[in-house]
Amino acid sequence: MRKIIVGSRRSQLAMTQTKWVIEQLKQAGATNEFEIKEIVTKGDQIVDVQLSKVGGKGLFVKEIQQQMLDGDIDFAVHSMKDVPAELPEELYISCMPKRVDARDVLICENGYTFETLPKGSIVGTSSLRRGAQILAARPDLEIQWIRGNIDTRLKKLDSENYNAILLAKAGLERMGWTDRVDFEALDPDVMVPAVGQGVLAIESRKDDAEVTTVLQLLHDDVTAKAATAERTFLKAIEGSCHVPVGGYATVNGDDVTLTGLIASVDGKEVLRVTKTSTDGVALGQAVAEELLGRGGREILASVNE
C-alpha cells in the first residue's frame, strides 16, 4: 500500500486542517499510510506587510505546488480562498470536502456589536474586501490593517488599540475556538464572504489516479458546485487580494445562486449582483460581466493604479 505524502503550511490552522482531512479519509475507508510534510511559503515569511502590497493570492500556495510538481508531496490541503483562480497545468482541485460556515465574524471588545460600536472605533482586518464592506455600512468606523494567525489577532485585540477585529468563522470552527470568544456572525447580505471562504481545497496531480481515488472519499458535490460558480466569477474579473471582491454561492436542488461584489477600498462605491442558474460556470461569468459593465471595471482599474 502506497504511503501518501501530504504537504501543509506550518501554521496552526493549516496543520489542524491537514490532520482533519487525513483523519476523515481514514474514517471513510482509506487504508494508506499518510505523512505530513511541513512547507514554509512566502506568505508565512511576510508577517508585517499588508498582503495586497506583496503579491496577493498565491503567496500561500506556490512553494507547495512546486513540491507537488517535483513529486516531493502527493497532495496538499489549502483554504480555498488562498488558491489563485489559475493553477499550474499539471495540478487540479481534486477534492472539496463539505463546506463549513462561510460567514465573516466580528469580535468586539466590551460586548459591542456591529450596530453599537462607538463612532471612531478601530476595526482590524487583513482583507480589503472586509474593510471596504465595513466602511460602506459604517463609514464612521476606522479600518487598520492587522496580520498574523487567528491566535495572534485575538491577542492583538486584547493588547493593542483595536476595538474589534474581523475573522472568517471557518477558521474559528476548525480550531475549535467558537466557544473561546464572543463573536457576531455577519450575514452575507451585510458582508459578502471571500470566494471559497469555508471551503477546503485539496490539490493534487492530474496524472495521479491513485491519490484522486482516495480523495474522492471526501468530495462533496454541493460544495464543489458553489465553489465552481464563485471561482469562475473570480477568474472572469481577474480578482486577487489587491482588490475588494467578494463572491458567495448557495445551492438549492439544481439551482445555484451567486452574489458577486466589487467595491472601492474606501467603501464609497459598492456594486452587488445576485443571479441564479443551473450552470455554475455560466453563472459566474454572467455575474462578473454584469458587475464589470455596471462600473466594476472602473473601480478595479482605480484600485490597481
Curated annotation (Swiss-Prot):
Pathway noted in the entry: Porphyrin-containing compound metabolism; protoporphyrin-IX biosynthesis; coproporphyrinogen-III from 5-aminolevulinate: step 2/4
Catalytic activity annotation: 4 porphobilinogen + H2O = hydroxymethylbilane + 4 NH4(+)
Gene3D superfamilies, A to Z: Periplasmic binding protein-like II (3.40.190.10), Porphobilinogen deaminase, C-terminal domain (3.30.160.40)
Database matches in SUPFAM superfamilies: Periplasmic binding protein-like II (SSF53850), Porphobilinogen deaminase (hydroxymethylbilane synthase), C-terminal domain (SSF54782)
GO cellular component, one term: cytoplasm
A molecular function (GO) term: hydroxymethylbilane synthase activity
GO BP terms in the entry: protoporphyrinogen IX biosynthetic process
Enzyme type, top EC level: transferase
Bound cofactor: record note: Binds 1 dipyrromethane group covalently.
InterPro entries: HemC, Porphobilin_deaminase_cofac_BS, Porphobilin_deaminase_N, Porphobilinogen_deaminase_C, Porphobilinogen_deaminase_C_sf
Pfam families for this protein: Porphobil_deam, Porphobil_deamC
EC nos: 2.5.1.61
The entry's keywords: Porphyrin biosynthesis, Transferase
Signal peptide per UniProt: none
S-(dipyrrolylmethanemethyl)cysteine: residues bearing it: 241
Cofactor: dipyrromethane
Known partners and oligomeric status: Monomer.
Other facts: The porphobilinogen subunits are added to the dipyrromethane group.
Family: Belongs to the HMBS family.
Function: Tetrapolymerization of the monopyrrole PBG into the hydroxymethylbilane pre-uroporphyrinogen in several discrete steps.
Designated name of the protein: Porphobilinogen deaminase
